């Protein structure tokens, strides 16, 4: 399920909750980065936890998405450490690329154009999972 990012979900996946998981668990996050404590995740990966991890979003990714950085050094410590693990893949916000998400973006874009023209408040796109 898609989990919204708020105070109740901040670091929902942490040392304590990871300890409850089987070592062979597969962890996938396509919701919000701050749901997973990256330091706890890295500690667990170092200890052999997780069969596989797929992160479309992660806390601290800020300047590492939507830009080709294939010819520069990774300066973000969390990104660099996450990429060390062969069982982990970073997908850089590709989960948004669904028909529903693109349709919601297109609808809100058109509504915003109309609202701007009429002097009304602008909205934002939200795709319900």
Question: What do the predicted segments below correspond to?
Answer:
Residues 24, 31-129:
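Rossmann-like dinucleotide-binding domain for NAD(H)/NADP(H)
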Residues 7-8, 13, 77, 92:
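Residue-level signal for pocket-adjacent positions within structured domains
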Residues 1-12, 20, 29-32:
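Rossmann-like NAD(P)-binding element
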């Amino acid at each position: 399920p898609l989990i919204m990012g708020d105070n109740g979900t901040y670091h929902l996946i942490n040392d304590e909750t990871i300890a409850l998981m089987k070592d062979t668990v597969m962890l996938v996050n396509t919701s919000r980065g701050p749901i997973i404590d990256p330091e706890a995740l890295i500690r667990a990966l170092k200890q052999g936890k997780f069969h596989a991890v797929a992160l479309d979003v992660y806390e601290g990714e800020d300047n590492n998405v939507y830009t080709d950085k294939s010819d520069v050094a990774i300066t973000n410590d969390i990104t660099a450490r996450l990429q060390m693990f062969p069982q982990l893949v970073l997908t850089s916000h590709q989960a948004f690329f669904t028909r529903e998400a693109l349709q919601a973006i297109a609808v809100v874009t058109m509504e915003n154009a109309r609202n701007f023209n009429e002097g009304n408040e602008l909205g934002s796109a939200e795709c319900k999972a």
